[in-house]
Amino acid sequence: MARSLTWRCCPWCLTEDEKAAARVDQEINRILLEQKKQDRGELKLLLLGPGESGKSTFIKQMRIIHGAGYSEEERKGFRPLVYQNIFVSMRAMIEAMERLQIPFSRPESKHHASLVMSQDPYKVTTFEKRYAAAMQWLWRDAGIRACYERRREFHLLDSAVYYLSHLERITEEGYVPTAQDVLRSRMPTTGINEYCFSVQKTNLRIVDVGGQKSERKKWIHCFENVIALIYLASLSEYDQCLEENNQENRMKESLALFGTILELPWFKSTSVILFLNKTDILEEKIPTSHLATYFPSFQGPKQDAEAAKRFILDMYTRMYTGCVDGPEGSKKGARSRRLFSHYTCATDTQNIRKVFKDVRDSVLARYLDEINLL
């Protein structure tokens, strides 16, 4: 204590070593103060959800809306992935046709199917004309179209119909992927990916983690200092099974994961932003795939996308309420967090722009106000 007082009151009494130590101490304090300001100025959002719920697409949208987007050279870099997605999709349908015993409508289609199956989809970097012709022929085959209509019975990329409908453009020489092509490209997220951007002079860091079960053990160290949790769930997966486990309903798995995350101690007072994604795909499939077949408690009208959306939102809301309240309404603990829900289409830039503005104006503004950053 005496030496500390001497440092403040009698700096001329210090030895050279003590003066050097004092300078180091001051520098450390300056760095710590700067770090504290920086920590307050960068807000961390954790992006969670099951595989193929649209997390990576959401990150791409943040780059387009709040960042520099994708330059022509960067979009060119997605070309092999777009090609691979097309080969993976067509291969999945050809294999499913055999399992589902769906015949080709034209005898020539067998030759084109054999050609496509001879190519390893993950080694594709160019799109040769013979493969382009084979793909275009097959996509016009009534058997392939019938197989596509039964896509809930096998795993097929959501982007399949989009890419196959644009084959002529995509297989042209000198093809450069559009922003929409990039948004719809699919590569499973492994490990942890982060994207930083600024909104109204506030730095945001969105942390995206792998959605497959095998990746979830890597989440643990992302939970600290998160101001909000964004949970993406697919509205269209009510009639599908997990890619990792063909016996488990994907929506039930997503609901269970949502409940598990809500129970984690790190999130006791963290606001939860629920994005019920893929409204477009739900609207496409609901006329022929009835929600009540997979969720018998649904009493709403058939072929009604709005009724289906409300029912699915209610399931997630009840899961949230159940994690806040114990049996018969008894409180499990003091929870100051709130649930904010939005219907989204992650491939629709205008939709995501509006939804994220709503998030910014509610959750982020509330948090910034609390720490006096507004």
From Swiss-Prot:
Q: Name one GO biological process term.
A: calcium-mediated signaling
Q: Which UniProt keywords apply?
A: ADP-ribosylation, GTP-binding, Magnesium, Metal-binding, Nucleotide-binding, Transducer
UniProt feature coiled coil, ranges: none
Keyword GTP-binding among record annotations: yes
Listed InterPro entries: Gprotein_alpha_Q (IPR000654), Gprotein_alpha_su (IPR001019), GproteinA_insert (IPR011025), P-loop_NTPase (IPR027417)
* Tissue specificity statement from the Swiss-Prot or TrEMBL entry: Specifically expressed in hematopoietic cells. Expressed in epididymis (at protein level).
Binding positions (Mg(2+)): S56, T189
**Per its UniProt entry, which superkingdom is the organism in?**
Eukaryota
- Asked if the keyword GTP-binding belongs to this entry, the reply reads yes
Residue ranges of region G5 motif?
344-349
Pfam families reported in the protein's UniProt record: G-alpha
Chain positions covered by the region annotation G2 motif: 181-189
Q: Which GO terms describe its molecular function?
A: G protein-coupled receptor binding; G-protein beta/gamma-subunit complex binding; GTP binding; GTPase activity; metal ion binding
Q: Which CDD domains match?
A: G-alpha (cd00066)
Q: Record's Gene Ontology CC terms?
A: heterotrimeric G-protein complex; plasma membrane; synapse
Q: Where is this region: G1 motif?
A: 44-57
Q: State the residue spans of region: G3 motif.
A: 204-213
Residues annotated for GTP binding in this entry: 49-56, 183-189, 208-212, 277-280, 346
Task: Give the ADP-ribosylarginine positions (modified residues).
Answer: R186
Ranges for the region named G4 motif are 273-280
Domain (G-alpha) ranges: 41-374
Q: What family does the entry list?
A: Belongs to the G-alpha family. G(q) subfamily.
**Subunit structure, interactors included:** G proteins are composed of 3 units; alpha, beta and gamma. The alpha chain contains the guanine nucleotide binding site.
Q: What is this protein called?
A: Guanine nucleotide-binding protein subunit alpha-15
Q: What would be the name of the gene that encodes this protein?
A: GNA15
